[in-house]
């Protein structure tokens, strides 16, 4: 998580929770002149388009006042979806036994991309079973992690 993403998470968590939703996480993606702020929300009853629109209005109001982003960007609010991103230790705990795809910031064993089943989370380290071998990754070294849906 970048410094800006951390700042945005701290700024936006309270309004999202006040609206009755969980802020699963967010991503700020810079792509030339087309940057995007993606906010993932969840609710015990699921997420509708109306829920996303409501949170978008709430978040937009905060962003307009605080103005933390210095470039032009698009705001996207959505559910985490089938390939749910994992941002926090609690997310890994919640999905123990599920298959995950992980991209590391710094390679471990000459690899940055890993797929396996979440075994456990201990503080800031997640254990993942990869091809019959348990691998351990520091959450601070995980650039991106997503559940792999089963059909």
Curated annotation (Swiss-Prot):
A GO cellular component entry from the record: cytosol
CDD domains in UniProt: YlxS_C (cd01734)
Coiled-coil positions: none
Protein name listed in UniProt: Ribosome maturation factor RimP
The species this protein was found in: Vibrio cholerae serotype O1 (strain ATCC 39315 / El Tor Inaba N16961)
GO terms classed as biological process: ribosomal small subunit assembly; translation
Family named by the database record: Belongs to the RimP family.
Protein encoded by which gene: rimP
Localization in the cell: Cytoplasm
């Amino acid at each position: 998580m970048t410094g800006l993403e951390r700042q945005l998470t701290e700024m936006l968590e309270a309004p999202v929770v006040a609206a009755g939703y969980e802020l699963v996480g967010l991503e700020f993606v810079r792509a030339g002149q087309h940057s995007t702020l993606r906010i993932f929300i969840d609710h015990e009853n699921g997420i509708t388009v109306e829920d996303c629109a409501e949170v978008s209005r709430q978040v937009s109001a905060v962003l307009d006042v605080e103005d933390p982003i210095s470039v032009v960007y698009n705001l996207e609010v959505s559910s985490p979806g089938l390939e749910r991103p994992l941002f926090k230790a609690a997310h890994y705990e919640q999905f123990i036994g599920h298959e995950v795809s992980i991209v590391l910031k710094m390679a471990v064993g000459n690899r940055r991309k890993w797929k396996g089943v979440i075994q456990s989370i201990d503080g800031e380290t997640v254990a993942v079973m990869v091809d019959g071998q348990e691998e351990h990754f520091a959450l601070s070294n995980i650039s991106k992690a997503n559940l792999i849906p089963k059909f």
